[in-house]
Amino acid sequence: MYEIKNRKKIYVASKYAGNVDANVAAAIGYCKYVISQNCIPIASHLLYPQMLDDNDPDERELGLMFGLSLLAICDEIWCFGDISESEGVQQEIVEARKLGKTVRYVKEGS
């Protein structure tokens, strides 16, 4: 059990806004992929929208800041899907680089 607790913590970055149902389903799949790689997924966009309103700018910003706090304790950030137009994911990538985290882009079907 000790080995499992010490697996790499991976911050899962993928888009949330837009087609939320499809994006949440995709994020769950990405987390399963991280688990299959013997790592621990951390997906703030599956957590904070459950308690914060993503359509309220103040609450959205709070959720993003909470996510960046989680990113700080992760070993790496893995980016999934088309993230080119996701402002939140781009912010997470910038923060990860500032923190010296490995940024990995995972292609679909990897």
Regions found by a protein language model. Name each.
Residues 1-110:
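Conserved catalytic or regulatory cores that recognize and/or transform ribose-phosphate-containing ligands
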